[in-house]
């Protein structure tokens, strides 16, 4: 079962952005698999009440590292810094609930591991929302997390006043305290948020076909073809063994329920 996301939010308020490694040092990359994440995105990854980074992606990283025969090391970055650090080989992979988009595929290899096509986003507010949702240009501002697909989509739409924040917590607080009338979230994340903040309501924002994304992908540097092949095989094996399905149930990544 998912730990209470409210505990995640409370923990996040009192814990400084977490770095799971000390200063850079020589590391045996044949023995240690370094995964970059951004622990502000429940249920994929977040900081629990004990200050530990947990979530669907973290459990998956552990399972993949076992397949690779390596020790797992998780490093924390701002979401929009993950791709750069991967391309510079400071990390071996990205597991951060990262949507597979054409623009990201131009920069890194993204290996699908969860979800099908995402054809909609979730609009969240503390006030009643019309269905279908009003054009976002009619709201004074729209809150969204920095570096995410949904931010990229909103910024591509003319006339929307976008307010970007580093974490899901900040996005929700922006709406909860009325600074922005609505926020836009990825549906599986929004589903968890709604459980912990029942005073919020949500509706669908359908995406045009050219903006659909292909689920979540594990990022690997394009110039590491052998790693891509090895990790892809590990993901395939974990799917066939039912491990990923089991983790999906554990972290309640299922159909989003809208009000």
From Swiss-Prot:
GO terms for cellular component: cell surface; extracellular region. PROSITE patterns: PROKAR_LIPOPROTEIN. This protein, although well conserved among chlamydial species, shows species-specific immunogenicity. The keyword Transport applies. It comes from the Bacteria. L-arginine binds at residues 38, 45, 96-97, 99, 104, 149. It is found in: Secreted; Cell surface. The keyword Signal applies. Gene3D superfamilies: Periplasmic binding protein-like II. GO terms for biological process: amino acid transport. Residues 1-25 form the signal peptide. Belongs to the bacterial solute-binding protein 3 family. Contains two domains, D1 and D2, which are both exposed on the surface and bind to epithelial cells. Keywords: Amino-acid transport, Secreted, Signal, Transport. This is Probable ABC transporter arginine-binding protein ArtJ. Probably part of an ABC transporter complex involved in arginine transport. Binds arginine. Interacts with host epithelial cells, suggesting a role in host-cell adhesion during infection. Was identified as a potential vaccine component. In vitro, induces antibodies capable of neutralizing the infectivity of C.pneumoniae.
């Amino acid at each position: 079962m998912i730990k209470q996301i409210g505990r995640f939010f409370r923990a996040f308020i009192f814990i400084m952005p977490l770095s799971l490694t000390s200063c850079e040092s020589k590391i045996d990359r044949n023995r240690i698999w370094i995964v970059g994440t951004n622990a502000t995105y429940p249920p994929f990854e977040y900081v629990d009440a004990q200050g530990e980074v947990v979530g669907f992606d973290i459990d998956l990283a552990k399972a993949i590292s076992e397949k690779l025969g390596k020790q797992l090391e998780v490093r924390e970055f701002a979401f929009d810094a993950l791709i750069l650090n991967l391309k510079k080989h400071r990390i071996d992979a990205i597991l951060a609930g990262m949507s597979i988009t054409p623009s990201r595929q131009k920069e890194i290899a993204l290996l699908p591991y969860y979800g099908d096509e995402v054809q909609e986003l979730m609009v969240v507010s503390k006030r009643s929302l019309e269905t279908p949702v009003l054009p976002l240009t009619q709201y004074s501002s729209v809150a969204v997390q920095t570096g995410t697909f949904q931010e990229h989509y909103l910024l591509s739409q003319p006339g929307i006043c976008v307010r970007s924040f580093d974490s899901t917590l900040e996005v929700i607080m922006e709406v909860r305290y009325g600074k922005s009338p609505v926020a836009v979230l990825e549906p599986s994340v929004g589903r968890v948020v709604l459980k912990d903040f029942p005073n919020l309501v949500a509706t669908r924002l359908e995406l045009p076909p050219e903006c659909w994304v292909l689920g979540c992908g594990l990022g690997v540097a394009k110039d590491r073809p052998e790693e891509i092949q090895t990790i892809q095989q590990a993901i395939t094996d974990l799917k066939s063994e039912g491990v990923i399905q089991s983790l999906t149930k554990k972290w309640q990544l299922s159909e989003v329920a809208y009000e």
